[in-house]
């Protein structure tokens, strides 16, 4: 017996007496998805011209061999992405290790690329693991110079998250010694910076097309955030900065839509030095960023950007848990929240990600276990409160990388589940071979899942002497 939900569609195609009947079965289903309405576009398709050999075929009187018919189909358009509530969980666990140089004896196209500054960005269907390569592999004969931050060979590359960034796996997006990327729900936006220190250039690529540029405004190493930009409703927000590594470096935000810059945002507040921000959505209205001050303080500059008004303000985090490296003892900086304290010269990019819940918000941070060296990485959390005014200590939540292992840059990102977003933090674990040999990185990833305590730290398993 046929179900009552079966509909019969009879399509008559008449071409010299040809009659075809098509029966299409359709079941009805309904999907409630985050209050976002699925949009449809009307797209015309033309049936291809076919040459039909109808010899010895009964019930056919005549055939027009060049007949074409126009049909209109309704095809769904991909939706812009919006931040959603985080998936349930109360702790982070080790999710993934990408340690390319465990395969360092492999040669040819399967050889691992020499990389640094890795980060992850996610679209609705996949996450991609990005990095900046020196256009060299290990093993190989081009190790010299792979410890340098900027040169003419560096490129922004990516692989699907979980793949090893080898020569054959990697997509080379553009020449760049600083980079970012994000997905607006329909397409990838890629950002790369290169050029001379005194006149660097930001380049933007949307899908496969190179779409826009932005020139240096302080003529002192224009650079971007080395982590994912953030998109909402088709608008993507990118942090950039330009200025001295040991002095003034004022940041800006670029509002980008379909690969083209549509607005510049100039933050107010404590703007002396802000770089390498790790940003995410606190809500549908606000992007928050934990950044690096390489000149004046071990506190993190904290940005709040209102996406409704396109305004941004920066203040220092007030917590007595100082997140930069090097840093003084926790709680040792006296005075108001805007006090710089000592040991402010130098710094490191820090991990930061939001846990959005119906009744509260969690802010997760990472910092090195060492106060002076890029060694180890620990996870911290603070629920609710205001990072600008809350002086309480952050709660330690587990060791992701022990003091025996390298912990360099860290970053945040969110994986798109069917109905919620999974917050994650990634850690760059650098194999520092000095100037004489290769200099590259592994990536450790921890994500919110389940309850209990963070159970295990990560090791790279790489011996550079082998």
Swiss-Prot record:
Stretches of the chain found on the membrane's Virion surface side: 32-466
Renumbered residue ranges of the record's region Hypervariable stalk region: 38-86
Subcellular location: Virion membrane; Host apical cell membrane
Top-rank taxon: Viruses
Post-translational modifications reported in the UniProt record: N-glycosylated.
Topological type in the membrane: Single-pass type II membrane protein
InterPro entries xref list: Glyco_hydro_34, Sialidase_Influenza_A/B, Sialidase_sf
Topological domains, Intravirion: 1-8
Function: Catalyzes the removal of terminal sialic acid residues from viral and cellular glycoconjugates. Cleaves off the terminal sialic acids on the glycosylated HA during virus budding to facilitate virus release. Additionally helps virus spread through the circulation by further removing sialic acids from the cell surface. These cleavages prevent self-aggregation and ensure the efficient spread of the progeny virus from cell to cell. Otherwise, infection would be limited to one round of replication.
Protein name in UniProt: Neuraminidase
Species of provenance: Influenza B virus (strain B/Hong Kong/8/1973)
Gene: NA
């Amino acid at each position: 017996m046929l179900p009552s939900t079966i509909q019969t569609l009879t399509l008559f195609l008449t071409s010299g007496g040809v009659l075809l009947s098509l029966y299409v079965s359709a079941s009805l289903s309904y999907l409630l998805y985050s209050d976002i309405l699925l949009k449809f576009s009307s797209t015309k398709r033309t049936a291809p011209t076919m040459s039909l050999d109808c010899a010895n075929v009964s019930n056919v009187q005549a055939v027009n061999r060049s007949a074409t018919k126009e049909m209109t189909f309704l095809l769904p358009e991909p939706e812009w992405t919006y931040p959603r509530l985080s998936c349930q969980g109360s702790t982070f666990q080790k999710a993934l290790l990408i340690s390319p140089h465990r395969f360092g004896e492999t040669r040819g196209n399967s050889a691992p690329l020499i990389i640094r500054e890795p980060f992850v960005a996610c679209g609705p269907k996949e996450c991609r693991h990005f990095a900046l390569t020196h256009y060299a592999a290990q093993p190989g004969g081009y190790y010299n110079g792979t410890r340098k931050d900027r040169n003419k060979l560096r490129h922004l590359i990516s692989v699907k998250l979980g793949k090893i960034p080898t020569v054959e796996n990697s997509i080379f997006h553009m020449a760049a010694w600083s980079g970012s990327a994000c997905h607006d729900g329909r397409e990838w936006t890629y950002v790369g910076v290169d050029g001379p220190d005194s006149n660097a250039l930001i380049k933007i690529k949307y899908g496969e097309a190179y779409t826009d540029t932005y020139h240096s405004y302080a003529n002192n190493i224009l650079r971007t955030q080395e982590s994912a930009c953030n998109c909402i409703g088709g608008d993507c927000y990118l942090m950039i900065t330009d200025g001295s590594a040991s002095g003034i470096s004022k940041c800006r935000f670029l509002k980008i839509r379909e690969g083209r810059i549509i607005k510049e945002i100039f933050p107010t507040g404590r703007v002396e030095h802000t770089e390498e921000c790790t940003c995410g959505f606190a809500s549908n209205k606000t992007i928050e960023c934990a950044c690096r001050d390489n000149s004046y303080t071990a506190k993190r500059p904290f940005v709040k950007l209102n996406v409704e008004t396109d305004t941004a303000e920066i203040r220092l985090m007030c917590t007595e848990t100082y997140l930069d490296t090097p840093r003084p003892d926790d709680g040792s900086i006296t005075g108001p929240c805007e006090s710089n304290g000592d040991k402010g010269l130098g710094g490191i990019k820090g991990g930061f990600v939001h846990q959005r819940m119906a009744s509260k918000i969690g802010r997760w941070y990472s910092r090195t276990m060492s106060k002076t060296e890029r060694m180890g990485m620990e996870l911290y959390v603070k629920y609710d409160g205001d990072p600008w005014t809350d002086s309480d200590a952050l709660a330690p939540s587990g060791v992701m990388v022990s003091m025996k292992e390298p912990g360099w840059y860290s970053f945040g990102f969110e994986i798109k589940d069917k109905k919620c977003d999974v917050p994650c933090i990634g850690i760059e674990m650098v194999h520092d071979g000095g100037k004489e040999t290769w200099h590259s990185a592994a990536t450790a990833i921890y994500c919110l899942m389940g309850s209990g305590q963070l159970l295990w730290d990560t090791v790279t398993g790489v011996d550079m002497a082998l």
